[in-house]
Amino acid sequence: VLGMACLTVQAAEPLTSLDKPEGRLDIIAWPGYIERGQTDKQYDWVSQFEKDTGCQVNVKTAATSDEMVSLMAKGGYDLVTASGDASLRLIMGKRVQPINTALIAGWGSLDPRIAKGAWFNVGGKVYGTPYQWGPNLLMYNTRVFPTPPDSWRVVFVKQDLPDGKTNQGRVQAYDGPIYIADAALFVKATQPQLGIEDPYQLTETQYNAVLKVLRDQQPLIHRYWHDATVQMNDFKNEGVAASSSWPYQANGLKAEGQPVATVFPKEGVTGWADTTMLHSEAKHPVCAYKWMNWSLTPKVQGDVAAWFGSLPVVPEGCKASALLGDKGCETNGYEQFNRIHFWKTPVAEGGKYVPYSRWTQDYIAIMGGR
């Protein structure tokens, strides 16, 4: 048993040098995060990497953080593009290993606002390489709202919208339990007496007030969304007027000439800062390090941001991609960093706060109308 314990500790020691690449790389990623030109041939940051390193890239897409965590538990993958609501679970569950940042040439070019993020720096160790970040915005139909809405109220409180029709059955909410934090920001602004400071650290009393807002919202919901493509279709063809969304959907719909726009509501927004994390039992660690390095090159950073509607973790990425253009970072919200409450896994901290396991249980019940 002792021998085994020593082995596991050693296995998690980061590499000190890179040998010959293993020829293969298996990545779990959000849809649209790793493109090889199959959707649109201009968007390809895989082919060149494969040519340069000989590492064949295989991508398994996942639509939610919970799905990523369960895929990582099954194993057989090298990397995952984990959001902050998954990263701590992966670290605590020992599914990912710390990395040696000295082996990542581009490390020094990281945005200092991201480099020290609490969602991947734990106990003096660095678990992974930042990839992209972005906000969860309020997307709305401009025909329904000639003047942009300035509050999340339009999706949380039953009301008539500016076109004179009710919002019932015309709004959406994200179907991940982490959406409880979006409701917490609304409660923080509208019920200040509850004293919510951090939407991911809710006491029992605060949490119950937030759940009430979500239960009241449930009859208004057209669909709880997680598939970006389905949400885009709902705005186009199903009469959805407002919802939380990613810049990805808004950019796609605008490109098709649809009447949509996005806004940062006055209550603030949640957001995600995603980290490429290395599986604790990765079979292709050299290819994984090569990918983490490649992922920080300014052009790759800019191209991903252009495609996904996200933001580069390397500031130079804002000026390195013809696809993103000079104004792309501004459009996607680069200056809004301080207004974003980035996703992180809610933890109990010795019983002070309601932990994520309860968020999951309760949100599933609420979505089911219970």
Model-based region annotation:
Residues 34-41, 81-230:
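Extracytoplasmic ligand-binding site segments that recognize negatively charged/polar headgroups
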Residues 78-82, 224, 241-246, 261-262:
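Paired acidic/hydrophobic, glycine-rich loop segments that form the ligand-binding mouth/hinge
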Residues 279-343:
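Mature extracytoplasmic/periplasmic domains
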Residues 339-370:
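Conserved C-terminal helix/tail region of periplasmic/extracytoplasmic solute-binding proteins
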Residues 86-89, 244-259:
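A ligand-binding cleft/hinge motif common to bilobed small-molecule-binding domains
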Residues 139-144, 185-188, 272-284, 303:
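A bilobed periplasmic-binding-protein/Venus flytrap-type ligand-binding module shared by bacterial periplasmic
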Residues 106-109, 211-217, 256-280:
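Periplasmic-binding protein-like
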